[in-house]
Swiss-Prot record:
Name of the protein this chain belongs to: Ubiquitin-like-specific protease 1A
UniProt similarity note: Belongs to the peptidase C48 family.
Superkingdom of this protein's organism: Eukaryota
Main function: Protease that catalyzes two essential functions in the SUMO pathway: processing of full-length SUMOs to their mature forms and deconjugation of SUMO from targeted proteins. Cleaves precursors of SUM1 and SUM2, and very inefficiently of SUM3. Seems to be the only ULP1 able to cleave SUM3 precursors. Cleaves SUMO peptides better than SUMO-conjugated proteins.
MF terms in GO: deSUMOylase activity
Amino acid sequence: MKNQSRVLNSELGDFDLSVLWDQILNFEGYGSYCFRPMDMDGYHKRSAGLNPCKHSGFSHSSRPMAPGIYRYPEVKSSLRRQVHAPVRILNSGRDRSTRQGSGNVLGTFLTRNNDMWKRNALDSSLRYRTDREVIDVDDELGDVEMISDDTSREGVENVAMEVDEVEEKAEMGNGLFSEVASLKNGSLRVGECSKANSSSLVVNRPVTDVTSFEAYRKVLESAVNRTSKLKDRGFVDFFKERGRALLRSLSSFWRQDEEPVEVVQREAFVPLSREEETAVRRAFSANDSNILVTHKNSNIDITGKILRCLKPGKWLNDEVINLYMVLLKEREAREPKKFLKCHFFNTFFFTKLVNSATGYNYGAVRRWTSMKRLGYHLKDCDKIFIPIHMNIHWTLAVINIKDQKFQYLDSFKGREPKILDALARYFVDEVRDKSEVDLDVSRWRQEFVQDLPMQRNGFDCGMFMVKYIDFYSRGLDLCFTQEQMPYFRARTAKEILQLKAE
């Protein structure tokens, strides 16, 4: 090897080997590190190693370089070069050498979000951009003749005459073009449309001078079509608004129809105040012979003994029931629109009409319902209530003129067809006697009401009967239960003490 080096040195003469090595080392195929072989000019005693070297920009020198330069080269950051080979992806797509610092990551995050926010703002502004209607007049402008400056006056006059004809047809345009008269000068300028409609009319290219009226006709027809669409839309909006108004009126009507029912039902369960409860307790503890109230029109006196039948566990007597029937009629007279027109017989009516000894006797009760006494005929009422006392049990019979049926209500759900037969016969006789009319009730239905609150003890039958009458006279369903009987007893006592049913 040494002999070969001497021969090579003798053949090359003064050739600088450092230049040759630099050219070899700067070859593009080498990586960031290259192998330094032993030179042939006396440097073979140095051990081989990996030394960093540059790829480009190396300063070539014509002088031999000192041995220490290759062994201890200047450390400089090499320029990164794109790798043309498969690369292993590490740490979520980046190796350790290409990982960014926290500062760069934060800067990249803010920059990326800033760009994203700008794009979103731009997209939102573009999303709500309203496209204007474009009228294409290019197809019909092929035959347009341009009017030159030296156009004869006759041609201009002919154009003006045609404009007059078009103006007569343009009246349906509702004034969309306020400057049509400017066409008489011999040219049509689309830009001369009224500014009020410039936002809704856009031509896709500027048209300056047009002698043909096809463009004008197309623009005018477009305006007319748009006007008709607006009119149609206005009619639809008007129709919708009228429909909404109708629905509002109907809903208000329904509410007006429902609200009184809710108010009346609420009034049927108004609790007693502390003062009223105290007054009722004092009345229940009064002496037996102490007259608490007197109703002058009916001549009924309520003593302490009579009122105590309204205490829980007691049977109702005739005086309390009859006075309460009178109070219900007075309540109806105070507010006739709030309650049904009813007639309330007392507890002695049916025993007079049907006597166990003589049977049915209309003459016994004929004078009970005279016009002079009542001020109205029974046939003009909605309902007629007849309390029925059967030995030790109270029930209710109703002549329902409004619904044309005879009803029987028993808190034990009993049935008494004979009672309804007697009442049907009575009503026919009553109408014939007072109105001289033969009433046919053969088509009227007899109903033994089953859907009603039931009695669960042996003493509340009278209270159930009174509340049947109260709720039916209000036009309400029987929406109460046995548990509310103590409240109804106290309320009835309060109303009797006040001589006013509520």
